[in-house]
């Protein structure tokens, strides 16, 4: 299946230290890591890399710290094939600590200020007018307005504080059906998103249209043994946005997104196993 779409992400980046442990430490417990490594991560970064693999090119509008870690993050994103447009902030780059347990589940502790792009940043925002779809994970209201210039705009509840009250219409909001922090996030948005996609992991999920039409999808089978869950949700959302940008019907777009989530879930954090154009 040959698909084409011009895609972009507006959002945030973290520099992540992963530690593989038998289980997440209980209060007062010391648990030895069997493996550890550093990698660029965060919702925006994971989505941008997934989109670069599917579309061949992905624009990423972001903001980074002015320290060496911020520079490492930008360099690594470019190595992963992302076209990075980053404003610099006079703060330390946001980091995160991620435990990966024997079940592949991730437990995340962010460290530092969440750094997001602003619409007044000197970035090539006009390029978004020629984009088919944008995934928005963070930024101010002006940055969200720039993102809305694309044909399709998909967002995560992580950007709720910006989206709520902005008056910007979303083509889709992709949220968790199980996370208490994301359940029913659409209820506070005006205008309401045209489409709400509620993911439920191995149970698949459900979509709800603005006209109250609904549908469900089944989770795709893993292409191999279960790996790390880190990045699976954002890989799903990015692939769904890519499919919308390529004008696939909702059910087909969700089937593709489900495959992307399953492929990532069968890989190592943060990017191994992500779906590519060759897999379509």
Which residue ranges define each predicted feature?
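Hydrophobic anchor at the start of a short beta-strand
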Residues: 7, 57-58, 84, 153, ...
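Conserved phosphate-binding/catalytic region of the ribokinase-like
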Residues: 2-4, 186-280
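Glycine-rich phosphate/adenosyl-contacting loop at the front of the ribokinase-like
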Residues: 1-61
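Active-site metal-binding loops of divalent metal-dependent hydrolases
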Residues: 13, 139, 235
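Structural beta-sheet core signal
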Residues: 9, 60-62, 155, 173, ...
């Amino acid at each position: 299946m040959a698909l084409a779409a011009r895609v972009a992400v507006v959002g945030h980046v973290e520099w992540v230290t992963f530690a593989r442990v038998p289980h997440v430490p209980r209060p007062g417990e010391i648990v030895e890591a069997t493996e550890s490594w550093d990698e660029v991560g965060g919702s925006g970064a994971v989505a941008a890399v997934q989109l670069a693999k599917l579309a061949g090119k992905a624009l990423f509008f972001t903001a980074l710290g002015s320290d060496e870690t911020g520079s490492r993050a930008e360099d690594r994103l470019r190595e992963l094939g992302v076209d990075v447009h980053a404003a610099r902030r006079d703060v330390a780059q946001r980091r995160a600590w991620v435990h990966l347990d024997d079940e592949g589940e991730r437990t995340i502790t962010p460290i530092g200020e969440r750094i997001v792009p602003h619409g007044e940043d000197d970035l090539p925002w006009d390029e978004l007018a020629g984009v088919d779809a944008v995934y928005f994970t963070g930024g101010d209201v002006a940055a969200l307005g720039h993102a809305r210039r694309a044909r399709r705009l998909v967002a995560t509840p992580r950007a709720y504080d910006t989206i709520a009250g902005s008056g910007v219409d979303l083509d889709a909001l992709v949220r968790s059906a199980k996370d208490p922090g994301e359940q029913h996030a659409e209820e506070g948005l005006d205008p309401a998103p045209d489409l709400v996609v509620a993911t439920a992991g191995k149970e698949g999920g459900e979509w709800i249209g603005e006209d109250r039409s609904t549908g469900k999808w089944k989770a795709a089978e893993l292409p191999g043994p279960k790996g790390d869950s880190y990045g699976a949700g954002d890989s799903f959302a990015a692939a769904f946005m890519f499919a919308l940008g390529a004008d696939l019907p909702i059910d087909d777009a969700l089937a593709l997104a489900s495959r992307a989530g399953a492929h990532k879930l069968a890989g190592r954090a943060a990017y191994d196993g992500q779906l590519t154009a060759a897999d379509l």
